């Protein structure tokens, strides 16, 4: 006779779920409500329904900024995931000394977000910067869109590469050494060991990294705004910058509608990721 599953453990999560609903659910409902109104002041609020969402969805600027955000996210993942795995492999070869490498990887994660772009802008200043010599090579992040993208991608990679490396290292360190030794006896190459032994056993950690970095890269704001304020010629004008400008312009109704659409985009990506992950899980 089958026994009913014991779900009493969910009671332990109840306080955290209530707190999450309070600090996350209520503000989200407030934003959705604001997005359905035209707000001038606290006393002048008019119902507009889905008008703001329709205007945004019919705007060419919205789709252009969405395309730039998705492109940046794809580039960030394409650069940071392989580099993070490579860094983790290097740390794994250091054995006990890997702890110092992990500390170095974690340092950028504790630097305040608003200080990171300022730090890098200072290093590429032609007169006093550590890498100021790149200006002599024709590098101009202020007026060249490709150069601006390179700076933003470099800054974001420096900031978050440590997270990818640490999680990938945790996955690689959990692989039994006996598997690698058996592969070495069989004459397997380093790539074969990684492809058939290590990679299948770190897919869980990589899935978490992929999801976190995908969502984080879509939220990029500080780097793009500080480095070139969305320029040149709106080349780095991401969704977050559009939202920030509407908030600064006191267009709270439009900003709330844009934030709601932004939330739906991220939620769709997370949902698609969860569905894809479940399909890859072996069935019992």
What are these regions (language model features)?
Residues 5-284:
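A structural signal for multi-pass alpha-helical bundles of membrane permease subunits
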